[in-house]
A protein has these predicted regions:
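A short beta-loop-alpha structural element at the N-terminal edge
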Residues: 4-18, 27
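Conserved GNAT-fold acetyl-CoA-binding loop/helix
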Residues: 24-47
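A short helix-loop-beta-strand connector motif used in the catalytic cores of GNAT acetyltransferases and
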Residues: 45-59, 91
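Conserved beta-strand in the GNAT
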Residues: 60, 66-75, 91, 96
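Conserved active-site tyrosine of GNAT-family acetyltransferases
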Residues: 65, 141, 146
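Conserved acetyl-CoA-binding loop-helix of GNAT-fold acetyltransferases
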Residues: 97, 103-116, 143
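Conserved GNAT acetyl-CoA-binding A-motif
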Residues: 118-129
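Conserved beta-strand-loop-alpha-helix junction that forms the acyl-donor binding cleft
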Residues: 127-137, 154-157
């Protein structure tokens, strides 16, 4: 099976919905106290805005003409921050691969393309957030070489 990693086009907005549903279900199952049961999709307007914004990156993974994965990311510019030096960070919002296509290297290809893009944009690092219940994602990102930098804590009232 040949995997093609490419930049998204407008038609992909509808084609990624099954993947967004998988992510929404995963988050709801892991934290039903925080996440709604219904998936929230990008509107076509929001998707179009991200496609046109040079700071945003939307990558698509295709296998045999089917969208089987995607990555959403954008550049965060830290300037004149109270504690950080000035730098650009490539923030990965989502990397998602259909359940039926996991463990085939597709996520790794998306991650590697994110790295290439981050380097081209002269970013210092890549950053992301992952919920502690999402053990598969944590293992995947660690396998890709990411390390834990901070830990966000919560106290439920």
């Amino acid at each position: 099976m040949e995997i093609i990693i490419r930049n998204a086009v407008m038609e992909d907005c509808a084609r990624i919905r099954p993947l967004q549903k998988e992510i929404a279900d995963l988050h709801h199952d892991g934290r039903p106290d925080l996440f709604k049961t219904e998936a929230r999709y990008f509107t076509e307007e929001a998707f179009a805005q991200r496609l046109q914004d040079p700071k945003h990156t939307i990558l698509i993974a295709e296998a045999d003409g089917q969208v089987v994965g995607y990555a959403f990311a954008w550049v965060i510019a830290y300037r004149n921050h109270s504690t950080y030096v000035d730098f650009d960070c490539f923030y990965i919002d989502d990397i998602c691969v259909l359940k039926s296509h996991r463990r085939m290297g597709i996520g790794k290809q998306l991650f590697e393309r994110c790295k290439e893009t981050a380097r081209q944009l002269h970013c210092k690092n890549m950053d992301l957030g992952v919920f502690s219940f999402n053990r598969d994602a944590i293992a995947f990102y660690e396998h890709c070489g990411m390390t834990e930098r901070t830990r966000r804590m919560e106290y439920t009232l």
